[in-house]
Amino acid sequence: MSKLQKSKENIQIALLGAAHSLNHSLFVIAPPLLSLIMNDLGVSKSVIGGVATIASLLYGVGALVGGPLGDRIGENRTITVCLMFSGLSTFIMLIASVMRSIYVYAVALTLMASWASLYHPTANSLISKTFKVKVAETMGLHGVGGTLGVVLTPYIAWFLGVNFGWSWAFILFGVLCILLALTFLKNFNKVEGRDEKSGTIIDALKIRELWALLIFNIAIGLFMKGVELFFPTYLEENRGINSMWASIAYTMLLAFGVPGQWIGGKAADKVGSKKVLITTSAGVCISLLSLLLLPAYNIGIVVFIVFYGISFYAHQPALNSLTGFLSPQNQRGAVYGVFFFTSFGVGSLSQFIAGYLADTYGFDAAFYFLTAFALIALILSFKIPKSSEHKRSL
């Protein structure tokens, strides 16, 4: 590979990492500000959890559109549209804040989610088609770039929310999305193989080797979405930690995801994705049980942050690489769309249920509910098909 080609690939990975970061940042703004938003809008945890569930469901459903759309019009164009319109949608949050309306907040969040939903299946399809060597490692680097940017988001969001109003935190990241959209399109060429007939959702569901992965992915989504929304508030209400330190704890969890993404990608290329997924599933279970059961709460929180941060994020490049390996190139967008729908869409149901359990029985009950799905994911990880996809990278 020439230096020019290598430099171009590095720029492409950096841009994808930035896009990945902003895509996730839009949805980690609310958790550290949740108490402030609920108080400002006058709603309960069940209501805010219900709104988050609807937005997350659309975030998942939109992936069913984003994947095939990327196969048809090009991943680069699809990602540009995603960034531009999800960024513009954040400005509606200012209206929600002024009107103190949960309904306007819901409109803003669902529009953000709908446009942002195009990103994940499209980006993973683009990576699997553009980078032919060490796909899992590249997936990991893409994740590292995304997580690095997201790491500071909870604290930045908290700072802006407390000092200027929670809506301005959304607007800042929306502006960054718009600026990145303006520079994204020209840095990616048309992917080879676009003339092939693109796959459909039905075609994706016919790939029998993917069914075990799909069910495993649903279990992951059912604990992930609840933890993502309620972890900072859990620390505030059940562990007596103030909002600033709860935001810092959430930031640290994301920070441990940076080495997690890199480790997961490297390990999947070396030993195969199945072993990585079993190990990371066990790590997630250890983290949640430590948070709930260790009598010294601060120790439990530290164990949770380290183990969950590394384990959860390490599973992503391994799972994404294996999914791409088992999928025909012309169907990868559709396949990734199905996978992100099951993870983010179906998984979003846990946000409403966890919010209801927290209101009715307390946050411990909600987190035991989420832990049950982590244990199910661990059991299912042993059923994932073995594959030699890592040999392609050696």
Segments and roles (model prediction):
Residues 28, 56-64, 150-151, 254-262, ...:
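Residue-level signature of mid-helix packing/kink "hotspots" within the transmembrane helices
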Residues 30-31, 209-258:
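Extracytoplasmic gate region of multi-pass secondary transporters
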Residues 72-83, 270-281:
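Cytoplasmic membrane-interface "Motif A"-like loop-to-helix N-cap segments
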Residues 84-99, 283-296:
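C-terminal ends and interior cores of transmembrane alpha-helices
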Residues 108-146:
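Cytoplasmic helix-loop-helix junction between adjacent transmembrane helices
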Residues 133, 142-188:
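Helix-loop-helix hairpin linking two adjacent transmembrane segments in secondary transporters
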Residues 273-322:
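C-terminal transmembrane helical hairpin of 12-TM major facilitator-type secondary transporters
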Residues 324-360:
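A late C-terminal transmembrane helix in Major Facilitator Superfamily
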